[in-house]
Regions:
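N-terminal alpha/beta PP-like core and its mobile active-site loop of ThDP/TPP-dependent enzymes
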Residues: 1-337, 373, 377-380, 460-463, ...
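Glycine-rich phosphate/pyrophosphate-binding loop at beta-loop-alpha junctions
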Residues: 7-12, 447-450, 469-472
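Short glycine/threonine-rich loop-to-helix capping motif typified by GTGT followed
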Residues: 33, 221-227, 397-402, 450-453, ...
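Thiamine diphosphate
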Residues: 105, 112, 456-550
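Catalytic phosphate/nucleotide-handling subdomain of diverse soluble enzymes
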Residues: 418, 422-462, 466
Length: 582
């Protein structure tokens, strides 16, 4: 048995079923072991290591299991970093395995001599270099356990010559007994102290206008959130990663928060006197109640994130579902439902506006039309992954999450490009579910080569590309946040439908809003991997639900300072936002 065999068999013992990676001479020993164990563990070969890291992150997000990615020494390991930071910042358990050069040539400027164990110090909560064959079992067990326990990244750096060394008894130190470690991981059953629960209940019972902010940590607590909202008469505001925490047809939710959120959500944050945060580290604190405005209670699994975004009075450390179940019996039902009713009335108006914008027949086609037509046709088991950019606005606002669906994106890192890798990982994890990527042309083109990975492995994913030939989010940030004319954001057009065909998939194109629904239906019903290229208006602004005076001023400044499309942009913005701008 080689050292690489010990690694692979340890991963199998930990229940790892798939590894995402790209071969290289720095991991040849591991590749050989994966070949000989291919009936027990599957290798998904990607075209870029960044895709492998994103796939491991997406796999872990959608399954709750450990995601594993593999890269060779030097540049291969470096390419993993962006996807690993995505996992780190969103609190996702991922194990990265990288090669290193020969153990006695490390640090001698040999080929691909990059000290990846040093490079990964910041991104990984566990980060070790293998020192010999008898070291592998201990380190692999500890790496897997740490990633799962801390919901974070672990990294193993494995010198290439050690990978192929035979495991021999005489190599062991006297304290390193064979099999003294195990593949056991126990999920925490931690519940808050009863005194903390009562103190939290007292605050929530005293509140007159209670709002709930739900994030990714609340995804498994839908029923408990709705029960809490009913008792407290509280609207549920959702962070992006919590899009599926409560379905959008729930009478309790006001949808998203922040730049991509809804007006009723923002009003709930501005007017509440009590805030319950459930499993969220939503980073844009300017959209939350001002410090001192509301009394705060937070439910959070990670103690170090307690009070991170808002000065809460009580922190309840524990799983969202179980903690809510313990807290609910201590609450009194509020007779005054006016705060919730105002939010519900606001949401009725909001959805009417969203539908009106999404059913326009203007040409060029509006991006909202594409999102709306997709949302209507998604199956109840759909898993929808999004990229970062203006695409996120339409994903957040125009696609209504239904119970049973899953949604995710790069929440805190806000990286471009994970939409496609997330979707492939979801399809591998759930081969019978509908898996869709909703992406922009800018983000998709960064890792578009891996569409051929979906073709190779016969993954029937669907990729909706909203094509506006611009880096839209950067463009609008230049204008609205800084008052500058757009610069450096135009993208040279790519024929994505032809690209799909070149990869062995199927491509569709739609430009006419009258044809969007029919084309979308045909595209979604195709049995194999497919791309829908939806050509949309590049001048459609993803403006906030409530435009601040400063933003309006900067917007006007950018037009006055020579914005090349100022006339068309002004007309489009005014037609949408006149009520907020006057």
């Amino acid at each position: 048995m080689t050292a690489a065999d010990v690694l692979v068999e340890s991963l199998i013992d930990w229940g790892v079923e798939v590894i995402f990676g790209l071969p290289g001479d720095g991991i040849n020993g591991i590749m050989e072991s994966l070949r000989t164990h291919q009936n027990q563990i599957r290798l998904i070969q990607v075209r870029h290591e960044e895709s492998a890291a994103f796939m491991a992150c997406g796999y872990a997000k959608y399954t709750g299991k450990l995601g594993v990615c593999l890269a060779t020494s030097g540049p291969g390991g470096i390419h993993l970093l962006n996807g690993l930071y995505d996992a780190k910042l969103d609190g996702i358990p991922v194990l990265a395995i990288s090669g290193l050069q020969f153990h006695d040539l490390i640090g001698t400027y040999t080929q691909q001599d990059v000290a990846l164990d040093k490079l990964f110090i910041d991104v990984a909560v566990f980060n070790e270099r293998i020192m010999g064959p008898t070291h592998v079992e201990n380190i692999t067990d500890l790496a897997c356990r740490t990633a799962l326990a801390y919901h974070n990244v672990a990294h193993i750096a494995f010198p290439v010559d050690i990978q192929e060394m035979e495991l021999k008894k005489r190599q062991r130190s006297k304290r390193n007994l064979p099999h003294h470690t195990s593949d056991v991981y126990s999920r925490s059953a931690r519940l808050p102290d009863t005194r903390d629960l009562q103190e939290a209940a007292d605050i929530l019972n005293a509140g007159k206008k209670v709002a709930i902010l739900a994030g990714r940590g609340a995804l498994n607590a839908t029923d408990e959130l709705e029960q809490m909202a009913e008792l407290l008469g509280a609207p549920i505001v959702k962070a992006l990663l919590g899009k599926a925490a409560v379905p959008d047809d729930s009478p309790y939710t006001t949808g998203g928060i922040g730049l991509l959120g809804t007006r009723p959500s923002q009003e709930a944050m501005e007017d509440c006197d009590t805030l319950l945060i459930v499993g969220s580290s939503f980073p844009y604190i300017e959209f939350m109640p001002k410090p001192g405005q509301a009394r705060g209670v937070q439910i959070e699994l990670d103690p170090k994130r307690m009070g991170l975004r808002y000065p809460v009075e009580v922190g309840l450390v524990g799983d969202s579902r179980n903690t809510l179940r313990e807290l609910t019996p201590l609450l009194q039902r509020k007779d005054d439902r006016s705060f919730l009713q105002a939010a519900q009335a606001g949401m009725k108006d909001w959805w009417a506006v969203m539908e009106k914008r999404a059913t326009r027949r203007d040409k060029p086609m509006k991006p909202q039309v594409v999102a709306w037509e997709l949302g209507k046709r998604l199956r109840n088991d759909a898993i929808v992954s999004c990229d970062s950019g203006t695409i996120t606005t339409w994903w957040a606002r125009q696609i209504k999450a239904r119970r049973g669906q899953m949604y995710s994106l790069s929440g805190t890192l806000a990286s471009m490009a994970p939409g496609l890798p997330y979707t492939m990982a979801a399809q591998i994890a759930y081969p019978d579910r509908q898996c869709v990527a909703f992406v922009g042309d800018g983000g998709f083109s960064m890792l578009m080569a891996d569409f051929v990975t979906a073709v190779k492995y016969k993954l029937p994913i669907k990729v909706v590309i909203v094509k506006n030939n611009t880096l839209g989010q950067i463009k609008w940030e230049q204008m609205v946040f800084l008052g500058n004319p757009e610069y450096g954001v135009d993208l040279y057009p790519i024929d994505f439908a032809s690209f799909a065909l070149a990869c062995g998939g199927v491509g569709f194109t739609v430009e006419d809003p009258d044809q969007c629904g029919a084309t979308m239906g045909e595209f979604l019903n195709h049995p194999g991997p497919a791309i829908l290229e939806a050509v949309v208006d590049p001048l459609e602004p993803p403006l906030p639900a409530k435009v601040k005076a400063e933003q309006a001023l900067h917007f006007a400044e950018s037009l006055a300072r020579g914005e090349p499309n100022r006339k068309e942009i002004a007309l489009t913005a005014i037609s949408q936002k006149v009520r907020e701008l006057i």
